[in-house]
């Protein structure tokens, strides 16, 4: 029997009350310093994989011991996952990196039925977990002591901008024929739908992260890790099938007017991207500050359409959880989901499809979202999300000099 890896966090907690530290998540007050110490319990002589399928972390939060259970988020990437960027002279360069042994996990806190966790273990521990109804973030501290991490409540991150942040969608998808409402109790694994998601990063965001493509890719992977967890409630499985970074220049006119940017991005996807890479839905991440309070926009009820199965999202926060929720929101519109009303509920939290982003982040879809999503799926039956792809999609005879790294090359 394979023994589960046990990792113990030895907590050296030094709350810096009233002081501030600058982390990737922003300026943070009142945090604790923790020192992860890995203790394995694998059989003697066993080869330890780089990233185990299951892990446990013991730590203290606010002086109380907790046990964090983590499982690798299998299926996070499609089998033909690709990454594309552009050389300074504009050549398209596409690679197919190995991603099976990745470092992204979902989890829960022991003895807390409502807890969730989304953690990257790539370079230290980075992510968030919900404990007793409160959201905590964890990330490595940039100190000479490489083992030091910070743990802090989401509410202790200083807000850069108190202005409201909203989705720009105003219309709803309406079914023209009455259909039987879906309920979670009568859905089975046969109803599962699969979305192969492609994410494009504009040149402004590339420059925002100082041209660090690795940092951008990690951020995107962490976001999709969060989205995949959220969509499980809707019986929808998300796999990231590709990332394209406009490292040389923008391929469309990215402008503050979100509707025009969305229209241009949809046309580009239809005429360019789909000819190079098969996928079900594409989202554009941009550093452009959209007009007004808008931070995202998408077409409603358009999943699988060559132009309209798209959305545009402003990279509006250093906290990847908030941007991930925004992308999950816009993808929800593509699936026919409207904004929540006061009668919608997701267990007392602000829900993903709220028209305005909440200062208390939520990873939960409401009961209204569930019904609307399956109304759309059963009425429109979008074909592209019926089955997950089981084979590599873009395989050709290896040819050197075309800047495309094919399978086998």
Swiss-Prot record:
Annotated residues for binding of Zn(2+): 329, 333, 339
Superkingdom to which the source organism belongs: Eukaryota
Domain Peptidase M12B: start-end pairs: 193-389
Enzyme Commission number: 3.4.24.-
Signal peptide: 1-20
Cofactor comment: Binds 1 zinc ion per subunit.
Species whose genome carries this gene: Bothrops insularis (Golden lancehead)
Protein name: Snake venom metalloproteinase BITM02A
């Amino acid at each position: 029997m394979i023994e589960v890896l046990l990792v113990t966090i030895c907590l050296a907690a030094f709350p810096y009350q009233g002081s501030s530290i600058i982390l990737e998540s922003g300026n943070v007050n009142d945090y604790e310093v923790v020192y992860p110490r890995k203790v394995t319990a694998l059989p003697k002589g066993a080869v330890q994989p780089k990233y185990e399928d299951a892990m446990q972390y013991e730590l203290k939060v606010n002086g109380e011991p907790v046990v964090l259970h983590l499982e690798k988020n299998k299926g996070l990437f499609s089998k033909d996952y690709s990454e594309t960027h552009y050389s300074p002279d504009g050549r398209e360069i596409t690679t197919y990196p190995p991603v099976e042994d990745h470092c992204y996990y979902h989890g829960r806190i022991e003895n807390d039925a409502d807890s969730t966790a989304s953690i990257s273990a790539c370079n230290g521990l980075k992510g968030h977990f919900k404990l007793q109804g409160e959201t905590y973030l964890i990330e490595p501290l940039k100190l000479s002591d490489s083992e030091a991490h910070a743990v802090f409540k989401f509410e202790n991150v200083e807000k850069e901008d108190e202005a409201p942040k909203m989705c720009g969608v105003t219309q709803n998808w309406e079914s023209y024929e009455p259909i039987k409402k879906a309920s979670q109790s009568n859905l089975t694994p046969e109803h599962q739908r699969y979305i192969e998601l492609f994410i494009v990063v504009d040149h402004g965001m590339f420059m925002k992260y100082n041209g660090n493509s690795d940092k951008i890719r990690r951020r995107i992977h962490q976001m999709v890790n969060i989205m995949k967890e959220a969509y499980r409630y809707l019986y929808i499985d998300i796999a990231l099938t590709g990332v394209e970074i406009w490292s040389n220049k923008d391929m469309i006119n990215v402008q503050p007017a979100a509707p025009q940017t969305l229209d241009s991005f949809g046309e580009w996807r239809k005429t360019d991207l789909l000819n190079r890479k098969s996928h079900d839905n594409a989202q554009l991440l941009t550093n452009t500050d959209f007009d007004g309070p808008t931070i995202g926009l998408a077409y409603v009820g358009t999943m699988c359409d060559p132009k309209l199965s798209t959305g545009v999202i402003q990279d509006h926060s250093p906290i990847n959880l908030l941007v991930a929720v925004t992308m999950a929101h816009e993808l929800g519109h593509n699936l026919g989901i409207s904004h929540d009303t006061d009668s919608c509920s997701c267990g007392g939290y602000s829900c993903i499809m709220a028209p305005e982003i909440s200062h208390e982040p939520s990873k939960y879809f409401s009961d209204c979202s569930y019904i609307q999503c399956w109304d759309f799926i059963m009425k429109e039956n979008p074909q592209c999300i019926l089955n997950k792809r089981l084979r590599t999609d873009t395989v050709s005879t290896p040819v050197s000099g075309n800047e495309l790294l094919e399978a086998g090359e």
